[in-house]
Structure formats: structure tokens, C-alpha cells
């Protein structure tokens, strides 16, 4: 019957839109992750060089490096996976093997030269979100560098700003990126720095990832999907007229 065919075509159109939005969000997420990883690894390599040049280490020297590179933490881990020097006093003697997040770095004692993690809650301070990278030291062990959410976002905002401005989803769909304060950092209408909700008209609070919802965005009835990475919300938007047009083709 007509209604059955219409319903089937509608479901297929929604499915196609869902697949396309997922693909575009994953693409942007990969770009943000790459920029984030590259940024912290570059800082960590530079700090490693200075640590190598210093030879003997003490907390005062690490604190100077902390200030110079404007990071949140620097720790030295020995060949047994124990923190033997750190800008954060409570980390002294911490066994990296004792936490889910921290033990990932033990591969650096086994032939891996460097590692960078996603932005996440840390083992030693539950509820505190950090991003860490580490690079091996020539004398054994490794140096680990971390920065907190404020430092992380300030650094990465510059790389993410405008990232999706010229990316289209289909013909007239587009991508938005908001930071963890729900302010736009990438928007095709050049509203970076403004409120995600007040500016775009989105009503549904950012919630479950990959859920397809129907919203009015910039005055147009649209399908919307969210993705999250490194403290950023990636929002894919496709106008309903394009979804319906695709169904009628």
C-alpha cells in the first residue's frame, strides 16, 4: 500500500541521514583528537629534552619547567613504574600499575617510546579530568606531562576554532562544535564564542551520543546528532527538506 511504501521510504531516508551524520561526526572527532594529541606530545617532547639536559632532577627544576611550558603537571617515572619526582607532591611514590588510567603508560617501560591519552578522569584523583602524554627518557623510565581542562581547552580551542565552518553534510547540512561551556567554537554562520543554545535555537540539551533527534536549528526543521570528544560537542545538522527530498528521489 501507499502508506506502507511511504513509511518504508521515510525509515530509509532517516537511516541514510543517520549514517551520513555519524560519518561526518566521526571525521571531525578524529581531527580534534589528532590536533589534541599532537599538541600535548609536542609539549612533552620539549620538556623531555630539557629534563635530559638537566641531568639531576629535583622538584624545583620541574616547577620551573611547569611554569615555562604552562602545563598542569610534570612527573618523572622510574624503570619500575613508580613516580620518583613530580610537581604534584601527593604523587610521590605512586605506583603507575595501581590505576586503570595510569597503568596504560607502563608500555613505555616495554619498548614503546611515547604515548598520549584521551582527556579523561585520572586514577589518583577521582573526579578530576586531565589529559596526559609521556615520552621515554634515555636513562630509563619516562617523563609524563598533563594539563587540566582549562589549560587543555585554551590550547585546543585555537586549533578547533572554525574547523567545521566549510564542511557540508549533504547539500545544505552543516557541522557545529561547542566547548564544555556550550559556547560555539566552530559555526558556519560565524557565531564563534556565542551560546550554542541561544544562538542556534537548539532546545534539547546535549545528551546521548549518536541519537538522532528532530530540532529547529537556525530556524529550519532539521535532523540533529551529537558526538563528544576531548571535552567538545560535535553537532551534525541536516535539514528535513533534504532528508525528504532524498526519500522522493
Where would I find each of the regions flagged by the language model?
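Generic short beta-strand
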Residues: 74, 175, 213-214
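Solvent-exposed, extracytoplasmic
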Residues: 54-71, 138-140, 147-185
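Extracellular/periplasmic ligand-binding regions of membrane signal-transduction receptors
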Residues: 18-59, 79-91, 140-141, 147-157, ...
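Amphipathic coiled-coil signal-relay and dimerization helices
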Residues: 82-89, 131-133, 182-190, 225-226
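Juxtamembrane extracytoplasmic/periplasmic/luminal helical "stalk" adjacent to the first N-terminal
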Residues: 1-57, 129-133, 165-174, 180
Amino acid at each position: 500500500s501507499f502508506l506502507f511504501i511511504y513509511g518504508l521510504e521515510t525509515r530509509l531516508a532517516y537511516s541514510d541521514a543517520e549514517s551520513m551524520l555519524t560519518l561526518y561526526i566521526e571525521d571531525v572527532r578524529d581531527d580534534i583528537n589528532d590536533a589534541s594529541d599532537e599538541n600535548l606530545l609536542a609539549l612533552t617532547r620539549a620538556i623531555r629534552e630539557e629534563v635530559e639536559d638537566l641531568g639531576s632532577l629535583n622538584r624545583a627544576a620541574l616547577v620551573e619547567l611547569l611554569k615555562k611550558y604552562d602545563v598542569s603537571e610534570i612527573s618523572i617515572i622510574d624503570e619500575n613504574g613508580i613516580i620518583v619526582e613530580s610537581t604534584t607532591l601527593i604523587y610521590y611514590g605512586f605506583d603507575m600499575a595501581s590505576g586503570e588510567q595510569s597503568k596504560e603508560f607502563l608500555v613505555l617501560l616495554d619498548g614503546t617510546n611515547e604515548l598520549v591519552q584521551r582527556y579523561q578522569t585520572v586514577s589518583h584523583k577521582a573526579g578530576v579530568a586531565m589529559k596526559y602524554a609521556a615520552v621515554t627518557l634515555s636513562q630509563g623510565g619516562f617523563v609524563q606531562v598533563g594539563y587540566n581542562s582549562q589549560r587543555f581547552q585554551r590550547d585546543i580551542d585555537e586549533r578547533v576554532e572554525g574547523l567545521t565552518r566549510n564542511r557540508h553534510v549533504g547539500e545544505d547540512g552543516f557541522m557545529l562544535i561547542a566547548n564544555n561551556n556550550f559556547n560555539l567554537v566552530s559555526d558556519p554562520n560565524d557565531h564563534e564564542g556565542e551560546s550554542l543554545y541561544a544562538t542556534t535555537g537548539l532546545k534539547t540539551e546535549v545528551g546521548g551520543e549518536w541519537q538522532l533527534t528532530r530540532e529547529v536549528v537556525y530556524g529550519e526543521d532539521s535532523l540533529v546528532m551529537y558526538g563528544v570528544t576531548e571535552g567538545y560537542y560535535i553537532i551534525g545538522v541536516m535539514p528535513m527538506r533534504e532528508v525528504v527530498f532524498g526519500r522522493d528521489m
